Amino acid sequence: MVSASPSGKITLGYWNLRGGPRGNVARYLLAYGGADWNEKTYTIGEDEWKNEKGTVMDFCNLPYIIDGDFKISETYAVHNYCAQKYCPELIGTTPQDKARCHQL
């Protein structure tokens, strides 16, 4: 079972893929924003993810973020959360700027 990191670090869960594009964006956002995080990676074809999936959170998918008691999954939600929390200057301040960022 995956739970919040005892060190208070965020946990990022994703597939153990070389250059996995969806996981990399979250990593880039966390690094750019100066976050301290742990990674939990899963190997495709092994049962670890299948066995843990229901214990992480309801409706869990990869990537996911666990930040204390807050848990969220799905690529867009994870990216949006990381950007808002750690590097809000990247997502704009006006509705127009935010919309432009969302279309990227």
For every predicted segment, state its role.
Residues 1-104:
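GST-like domain detector, emphasizing the conserved glutathione-binding G-site
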